[in-house]
UniProtKB/Swiss-Prot annotation:
Compositional bias ranges of the Polar residues kind: 184-202, 291-318, 391-401
Subunit field text: Component of the super elongation complex (SEC), at least composed of EAF1, EAF2, CDK9, MLLT3/AF9, AFF (AFF1 or AFF4), the P-TEFb complex and ELL (ELL, ELL2 or ELL3). Component of the little elongation complex (LEC), at least composed of ELL (ELL, ELL2 or ELL3), ZC3H8, ICE1 and ICE2. Interacts with AFF4; the interaction is direct and leads to stabilize ELL2 and prevent ELL2 ubiquitination. Interacts with EAF1 and EAF2.
GO (cellular component) term, any one: transcription elongation factor complex
Family statement: Belongs to the ELL/occludin family.
GO molecular function: cis-regulatory region sequence-specific DNA binding
Compositionally biased region (Basic and acidic residues): 471-490
InterPro entries the UniProt entry points to: E3_ELL-like (IPR042065), ELL/occludin (IPR031176), ELL_N (IPR019464), Occludin_ELL (IPR010844), WH_DNA-bd_sf (IPR036390)
Species for this entry: Homo sapiens
Name listed for the protein in its UniProt record: RNA polymerase II elongation factor ELL2
Its biological purpose: Elongation factor component of the super elongation complex (SEC), a complex required to increase the catalytic rate of RNA polymerase II transcription by suppressing transient pausing by the polymerase at multiple sites along the DNA. Component of the little elongation complex (LEC), a complex required to regulate small nuclear RNA (snRNA) gene transcription by RNA polymerase II and III.
Extent of Basic residues compositional bias: 457-470
Amino acid sequence: MAAGGTGGLREEQRYGLSCGRLGQDNITVLHVKLTETAIRALETYQSHKNLIPFRPSIQFQGLHGLVKIPKNDPLNEVHNFNFYLSNVGKDNPQGSFDCIQQTFSSSGASQLNCLGFIQDKITVCATNDSYQMTRERMTQAEEESRNRSTKVIKPGGPYVGKRVQIRKAPQAVSDTVPERKRSTPMNPANTIRKTHSSSTISQRPYRDRVIHLLALKAYKKPELLARLQKDGVNQKDKNSLGAILQQVANLNSKDLSYTLKDYVFKELQRDWPGYSEIDRRSLESVLSRKLNPSQNAAGTSRSESPVCSSRDAVSSPQKRLLDSEFIDPLMNKKARISHLTNRVPPTLNGHLNPTSEKSAAGLPLPPAAAAIPTPPPLPSTYLPISHPPQIVNSNSNSPSTPEGRGTQDLPVDSFSQNDSIYEDQQDKYTSRTSLETLPPGSVLLKCPKPMEENHSMSHKKSKKKSKKHKEKDQIKKHDIETIEEKEEDLKREEEIAKLNNSSPNSSGGVKEDCTASMEPSAIELPDYLIKYIAIVSYEQRQNYKDDFNAEYDEYRALHARMETVARRFIKLDAQRKRLSPGSKEYQNVHEEVLQEYQKIKQSSPNYHEEKYRCEYLHNKLAHIKRLIGEFDQQQAESWS
């Protein structure tokens, strides 16, 4: 810790500020929060330090520690104050501090030096003296209040109150039932209904109460807390409000208000007991704006004819998030066909990979599925969750901050290691056209082949597969059986030979058309690549850090759930590979996969939304962390 100069800053006077390290790299700047007892002990020591042979000391033990301040009477005793260490950005994400030291030169000129960011805070714990002092103050306040309420008030006295009119009893009443004279009679049903509604809401989960309030309007944190307290809030729930807001809401840095995240709107209940009729109508309008646009877009696209051109590259950001190397077991039919027909193939010296060409050529497009708009190819800056970027390492003890002190790397997504686990089992439950499983890292053509070629090739493949169904399983004749590895290799070689013998005009047209659709003008960047650009100031760096902290906990929770689901199928896939196809053990594992799929489908109905949200947050946080690391590295180089 560094102590400032003895002088103070004067009004209407200019000071120079130095932001260099001045060769003092061993200085650690901390924000210290003292209790009144600790301040009084320090002041006593300062006034008698020439008479006290001992000096104050501070000891750190992890995130806790002890401060010892010698007493002046008796001299051999000390004050002991426990403290704990916390991160400033995590406790107060809306602001940060710089430590400024005022020094004086030999000529008497004042100079201000910036010693660095205050990233950690020491909070001294209260002692018995603090509690005793608080009790004494409360007793004194109660005594003053009691004296004030029993004192005889005289005209012109210090506690002159308002006059109270005493109603006189009516002398003559014509009506024999005086109760009828009551004005504005109250309906007891309304009172009972309000009381019942309030008690019902207070018993609901605290998170549900928060999201149903944020669904109607944006709230600042104090406003939201005051609104929640009207229906009753216990101390435990009050302390968890910050963590809940980080999970379900976005913070507006301009007015510090919170708005509900889009994916949470699906959890809202239209019959929430705390809503009035006006609130319910308002909720309906909000839900129609949030949930219906995607349905309208899907309905419009079904009526359009499929056209393979560069215009197909324009699509919504939500559909772009579907592109992932991990084939999960809960992918629905429309989304699967849409994103598999629009992946960009790997290129070798500017030419398409033959394997990818073959895979794309063999995709039959049903009328309904073919009309689904195609998402654009991902830009080079898009980072799939299966291949996370290498992020700047750091040496910190706080996992929630994206830079320097207090950083842990984002977890690598292990659930993407086996990209095509049980893709065919998934086809059985959705009755889709069979798509060959691609090896990890390979992707499909963005534009499909011309419809005539697609139709002819899909017709040939359907004949081969229909024979296979009759031989293997008459019961599941409409489903697609698992394609064995040897048969895949043989068919792949046959299709490659057909492609090589095809006319150069047709293949060139496809390549040329797909190349045109991949031009940069048709690529839509993720929103975080547009919002978060290179950092040029410390204020911008702090804003990025706050955004990182606001979504980090949500990402960790989603990542843990996705990884748990993926590990089940990876384990079963490893068992399947050790067994011979057609054996009883192989069939048992196959049935186990189908049962596991049904369990996940029932227990996690929002699995797809959570998975895409997890991928999006991973790429966004990695991008923010990289920008902060680059900025810190630039600052370190400028100081050296």
